[in-house]
Amino acid sequence: MRLFLLLSVLSCVAQAAKPPVLFRNATVITMDGGKVLAKHDLLVQDGRIARISPTGTASAPEGSTVVDGTGRFLMPGLAEMHAHIPGPEPAGYAEDLLALFAAHGITTIRGTLGQPLHLELRSRIERGELIGPRLFTSGPSINGNTAPDAATAERMVREQKAAGYDFLKMHPGLERKVFDALAATSRAERIPFSGHVSTAVGVQAALAAKQSAIDHLDGYMRALAEERCLDGSEPAGFMGVGLADCAVESRIPELVTATKKAGTSMVPTQILIEQWAAPPTDGILRSRAAYRFLSPTTIAQWRKARMQFVQASPQAKRFVELRRELLRQMHAAGVPILLGSDAPQLFNMPGESTFAELELYGAIGLSPMDALATATVNVARFFGQEDRFGRLREGLEADVLLLSADPGINLANVRKLEGVMLRGRWLPRARLDVMLDEIAARQARR
């Protein structure tokens, strides 16, 4: 009872700490039907966007915090659709990681390797007790080891649904009959499944089963490969890199059509692949300020692993080119692309890797607005929550970024954060810098 009262008090305090905020005279990039509103005010009350109006046409409510938006740009918060949240050890690291996402303007994440702690973290964020992005979390991994037979897979689906996880995360190694049982049970339990594509399943079967999302473009290289390369004599390697020289590029349109028809979304994690496949230039990590949130030991381990990958994967360049072409054709065909970088993961740090993934979409050929949609409105649509977030529209939850330059002209401008609003909680640049310094200091002691 005492704990319940304490949590209730904390929740009330968190809610009370959200006075009205008026962003005055900004350019509002709504991500809502392409509307960009110059010289507009945006008012946030009670955690939601209360009003968007031409500057000078309405006054600020009494007690409002007024933020000068002159020469600045407002856009919806970004989403990271392939995030990893740690467990309870080391103490406090999971909370720091969530704050790290938020401090970079990531206001929604999809956690792809869940555990019970993450359900608790999700609740704490929703109650306003913890600074962090909106969290959608999978349950624990379903793979060839954890689900060796159909009965086990069916039980795991039911248990994870009952526990309150948002979706199921599949990893490699599932036998076809196990996958079929998982897919059927997930439909019956009304919980989506997504993630990897097991070799015994294949992309076409995953699409036919209506897998909600495929991460890493997993399985697509195998689907493109000539049959002679699939007898086991050619090692497939990381995400199919060893099959790149066997890939038949003319098969891409057929695969894209099947993907579009299935309604399956793509979470590419392209920056993860390109980081791995880049020339082994020494110091690739040292120049990045984001890596102050890592221990030197971790950086050394990542560098060693990357060198081994590059040396063992002469087809890496072709692999990257094929993946880029897949993404180009998928986007052109209208396959939903959801920004996911895989962070924190090898060479990917929260925030930095999301920005880099976004910029890669621009390099591949997406317009800035289409690229921004992969991290905003596309994500809300994927979760069936367009009435909650993903756009700047009156009535939606106030996840808002204040930028000093226009991301609709240059995607790199998403890095120019002057403040982040998390469901009505305003964090100006000075506050973000303090948060980041504190996280780095704690990480240095771990």
Task: Label each region the model flagged.
Residues 28, 33-75:
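Histidine-rich, glycine-flanked metal-binding segment
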Residues 156-167, 171-174, 220, 224-364, ...:
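Active-site neighborhoods of metal-dependent hydrolases
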Residues 394-440:
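C-terminal cap of metal-dependent C-N hydrolases
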